[in-house]
UniProtKB/Swiss-Prot annotation:
Pfam families: PQ-loop (PF04193). Its main location: membrane. One of its GO terms (biological process) is phospholipid translocation. This is Solute carrier family 66 member 2. It is a multi-pass membrane protein. Residues 14-80, 149-215 form the PQ-loop domain. Keywords: Membrane, Repeat, Transmembrane, Transmembrane helix. It is found in: Membrane. GO terms for cellular component: cytosol; endosome; membrane; trans-Golgi network. The chain crosses the membrane at residues 15-35, 49-69, 72-92, 118-138, 151-173, 212-232. PANTHER family: PQ-LOOP REPEAT-CONTAINING PROTEIN 1-LIKE PROTEIN, SOLUTE CARRIER FAMILY 66 MEMBER 2.
Length: 250
């Protein structure tokens, strides 16, 4: 009787841990962006944050959702993608509003201009929505046509996680161009690192598709590189680039 009771407790604890891990996986990905969002809102300055981070996460999570139709993976990962897309759109909305408000004579730039020089630097949030919808429509249609091809499905999954693995690269490049990490939330990067480490372990333990595990580890390496930038640029400060060059970086 005691043994049965003990087994029930162990089973309950395992279920609790599994439920907690799933919740952490679903919502943990958006937590790092909370301090960055608050910093931008408080300072009304978005120059230190690369909006290309949002672009890469939107692409990665849209592709991951499409990958799910060809290769079902755990539901928490699917919900994580949906919540991350909403979060990135909110980040883009704030960054766009702040950037336009800080420009003296903002020239209207829109998605329908199809000007590559100003890609992802449009003046209205609706243009970002149009771009995301266009990308989703095109990739969704291609996926619908090739969903029966195992090779296409695996490539789609790889592109999804590989794009997410390069998430920190735009921020890494922006910091390098500015020779500074000013304006970037260090809390965000620390949360990236801890979250990506947890995520990589989650992928391995739950036997997620191999693409997830490999690219999760790559993400951790990029996070560590950004943290090294924080140390180097604070310990050995260099002459900052001009505002014009900074704005040009990304």
């Amino acid at each position: 009787m005691e043994r049965e009771g003990l087994e029930w407790i162990v089973a309950f604890l395992r279920m609790l841990v599994s439920w907690g891990a799933s919740c952490a996986m679903i919502f943990g990905g958006v937590v790092p962006y909370i301090p960055q969002y608050r910093d931008i809102r408080r300072t009304q300055n978005a120059e230190g944050f690369s909006i290309y981070v949002c672009l890469m996460l939107l692409i990665a999570n849209i592709l991951r959702i499409l990958f799910w139709f060809g290769h079902h993976f755990e539901s928490p990962l699917l919900w994580q993608s949906i919540i991350m897309i909403v979060t990135m759109l909110l980040m883009l909305k704030l960054c766009t509003e702040v950037r336009v408000a800080n420009e003296l004579n903002p020239k209207r730039r829109s998605f329908t201009d199809f000007d590559t020089a100003f890609f992802w630097h449009w003046t209205r949030f609706i243009d970002f929505i149009q771009c995301v919808l266009a990308f989703t429509g095109v990739t969704g249609y291609i996926t619908y046509l090739l969903l029966d091809s195992p090779l296409f499905v695996e490539i789609l999954g790889f592109l999804a996680v590989f794009t997410e693995a390069l998430l920190g690269v735009p921020q890494l490049y922006r910091n390098h161009q500015n020779y500074s990490t000013e304006g970037m939330s260090i809390k965000m990067v620390l949360m990236w690192t801890s979250g990506d480490t947890f995520k990589s372990a989650y992928f391995v333990l739950n036997q997620a598709p191999f693409q997830f595990s490999i690219c999760g580890l790559l993400q951790v390496f990029v996070d560590i590189a950004i943290l090294l930038q924080v140390y180097l640029y604070s310990a050995y400060p260099q002459k900052p680039v001009s505002h014009a060059t900074s704005a040009k970086a990304l």
